[in-house]
Curated annotation (Swiss-Prot):
GO MF annotation terms: ATP binding; ATP-dependent protein folding chaperone; unfolded protein binding
Record's protein name: Chaperone protein DnaK 2
Modified residues (Phosphothreonine): 199
Gene3D superfamilies: 1.20.1270.10, 3.30.420.40, Actin, Chain A, domain 4, Substrate Binding Domain Of DNAk, Chain A, domain 1
Amino acid sequence: MSKIIGIDLGTTNSCIALLDGDKPRVIENAEGERTTASVIAYTQDGEILVGQPAKRQAVTNPKNTLFAIKRLLGRRFEDEEVQRDIEIMPFNIVKADNGDAWVEAKGKKMAAPQVSAEVLKKMKKTAEDYLGEEVTGAVITVPAYFNDAQRQATKDAGRIAGLDVKRIINEPTAAALAYGLDKQGGERTIAVYDLGGGTFDISIIEIDEVDGEKTFEVLSTNGDTHLGGEDFDNRMINYLVGEFKKEQGIDLKSDPLAMQRVKEAAEKAKIELSSAQQTDVNLPYVTADAAGPKHMNVKVTRAKLESLVEDLVQRTLEPLKIALTDANLSITDITDVILVGGQTRMPMVQAKVTEFFGKEPRKDVNPDEAVAVGAAIQAGVLAGEVKDVLLLDVTPLSLGIETMGGVMTKLIEKNTTIPTKANQVFSTAEDNQSAVTIHVLQGERKQSSYNKSLGQFNLEGIQAGSRGTAQIDVTFDLDADGILHVSATDKATNKEQKITIQASGGLSNDDIEKMVQEAEANKEADKMFEELVTARNQADQLVHSTRKQVEELGDALPADEKAKIDTAIADVETALKGEDKAAIDNATQALMTASQALVQMAQQQAQAQHAQSSQQTNDTTGQSSTDDDVFEAEFEEVKDK
């Protein structure tokens, strides 16, 4: 069996590792570096450059040098965060025919997975050069808070790169594998704080060893898929551009070449300020006007950088609280804190994490390499090279379908261990309904419209009947990669329809963050909406059953009673068009009062039928009943569920 490699496909940098014997090893690329810049350049002579060679020519080729493409994976062009990126990226982000966010280089439009595949190709080539053989299998990591569309897009990138993606695993989980594989002892609970180039994740993971088998179980995860080192860089870029404009009166944002130089200088200054208290940004001949060339010379202190990004660091703390709450743990339950991602080298980040958890983060984990090392370990598990390791990951957000009244009915709750499977039986909402639409949603809100639509499909050819009689079995199958497969089956006809959620229906990065935060902030609104829908459904059901009883009684129902009931039904239907729960409740109560005569007549009719049936039974059996003891019993019919 050929070697399976582990790849950390990062926003800013990527890394590859594999098992060398029984030890994971990070492989150096052709330039001798252990990490590869996630930068892709399309040159004038048709060459595609990846990594440091691409970065080196970026100043002279800014429009065709692409970076931070991971931020576009599984994204729609209209997404708010994509629109923000359009304003600051030197290259063109364009709208694809299907609405996805694509990029343009040398006049050619390309999908984000297509561009990311170039980085994966370099990773693949690096491994093949080291091993001296072809490599096809890979485990690729993604942020824990990546949604279905983003995970699918990552797999697509692997496929384009010629890789068989054996597994998609979450970056914090991979880091936990790298940290905990060789740790001896009993149970420990760790917090993995992963602040990378474009995303932030926090995962609470329990590591336990029982009978020689080491288990890594993710208890909860949270995060922000639009928060990372690139955002820190942008704050520095805006500061430098602003200072230059104040001094020279020239706005560099309209000059792609100048902005590329400023970007490189900002990133360099940010890194230097992790070890120095101040640094100078010197860019001679950054631009020119009628008076001659202009030079940038700005002194930046660590304190200034911290003031620019303080709110970004603060944004990482709320997900920490939610993750602990979801795991039913307190800060004192955390044994170790692991920092992952290059941005965690910033002293301010380390200080905030230390202050939050009340303990220093571990220093024995390489934040740039731990994720790739963990991916290599998981690759070894899949290849049978690593024994006695069990990885139990979770889904970050709840999954469900839209049901009557615009409610999201959850089939799989957030933080459920994957792979997992869940099913639920639903029925039709209308009489003689021959088709249903299965609308798949992801999020935490009760109201469907506040969650993200992942896709929808129709199940047709349902056996016609009155509402509620057809039974539709909906099954959600969430695989180990966190990718969802949905099927719906009509139990009467066994007709089935399936769908695998595709990237075009995925979530945007801000959407996921907003869903969870809004769910926390809008619990009361959700409760009121749920009560409104319940009232609506009860009223609708009462109207349906009342009309049915009126039809069954026919002429036996006095005309004045029928008129009262018809008026009450009309009032309910009017109330149902509004959003006032009290009005619906009042109209429902009025209908119940108006239909009391109907109920009494139905009961009298049933009693008369019962009496007639009993008389016939007595006439038939009276002569044969002698001295034998006769026992009466009630039998309850048990129906198959």
